[in-house]
Regions:
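Short, charged low-complexity linear segments at domain edges
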Residues: 30-47, 138-157
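Hydrophobic, well-structured mid-protein blocks that either form specific transmembrane helices
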Residues: 127-131, 143-144
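Bacterial N-terminal signal peptides
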Residues: 6-15
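Positively charged n-region of N-terminal signal peptides that target proteins for export
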Residues: 1-4
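Electron-transfer interface patches adjacent to heme c in soluble/periplasmic c-type cytochromes
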Residues: 19-40, 50-126, 133-137, 162-262
Length: 262
């Protein structure tokens, strides 16, 4: 009888404890939200957007993020999208690389090979914070009008469910079902509109644990690392396809980027 009572107590206490910890994390984030350090990256990003840089000594103020040259507000929530000038579906980071190469003369290939948090990659993270912040509070509306956009979504869905690696993991292993947690942190179900809105809609973000701002490309590459897969690479078709899948699933959700993460 005593063993039964103890087991019943633990069965009740553990979910309550996990929920209490989850609530505590949410409260902690809310306390920090008003002073999100990502604002420092946003401020730097705005300066970089307007500053003449690179071999061509030009600014990014003529960069077309999808709404016309120089238009920043509202662009982030419509990415990834197809761009006729490159013939590719591009996300924000991929498009920034294109503009940095075409307008400023930087070597996009060399930058893409730079480790996260180093060199020009630091500047891209600041630009990402600035551009995403200009669409904060707006709703995601990632297009599926072009055949290439549809193909990217379909590829992203397949990649999301692909299982492999030493752990036989897929993205769906952690993010394909409601109610999952890791280290007492809730994991959003990215196959649903609500979950994709909470997950996709909160990147880029300042990570308290690393003291750095992470873009979605860095987040996705780290997910592959955690699965023990080879790195897909910066702005690869794999990561762009996943972003398209998540972005379409998040249609109508409000962007809170740049957000705050543990």
């Amino acid at each position: 009888m005593n063993r039964f009572v103890a087991t019943a107590f633990l069965a009740c206490a553990l979910p309550c404890s996990a929920q209490s910890a989850s609530d505590g994390i949410a409260e902690y984030r809310a306390m920090l939200a008003d002073g999100n350090p990502a604002e420092l990256w946003q401020a730097k990003g705005e300066l970089l957007w307007k500053q003449s840089r690179g071999p061509k000594q030009a600014s990014l103020e003529r960069c077309d993020l999808g709404r016309g040259p120089g238009v920043v507000k509202g662009a982030f929530v419509e990415l990834p999208r197809f761009f006729a000038d490159t013939g590719r579906v591009q996300d924000l980071e991929s498009r920034l690389l294109t503009c940095m190469q075409e307008l400023q003369g930087f070597d996009a290939v060399a930058i893409a090979k730079t480790p996260f948090g180093k060199g020009e990659m630091l500047n891209i993270e600041s630009l990402v914070a600035y551009v995403s912040g200009e669409s904060s509070g707006m709703k995601f509306n990632v297009s599926q009008a072009h055949p290439e956009e549809k193909a990217m979504y379909e590829a992203g869905e397949k990649i999301f469910y692909f299982r492999g690696g030493p752990y036989d993991f897929s993205c769906a292993s952690c993010h394909g079902q409601e109610g999952k947690r890791i280290r007492l942190q809730d994991l959003p179900d990215l196959t649903t509109n609500k979950g994709a809105g909470a997950g996709f809609g909160s990147w880029p973000a300042y990570r308290v644990s690393s003291g750095q701002l992470w873009g979605m490309q860095r987040r996705l590459n780290d997910c592959f690392r955690q699965q023990r897969f080879p790195s897909p690479g910066y702005v690869s078709d794999v990561t762009l396809a996943l972003e398209t899948y998540l972005g379409v699933n998040a249609k109508g959700a409000e962007s809170i980027a740049p957000a705050l993460k543990r």
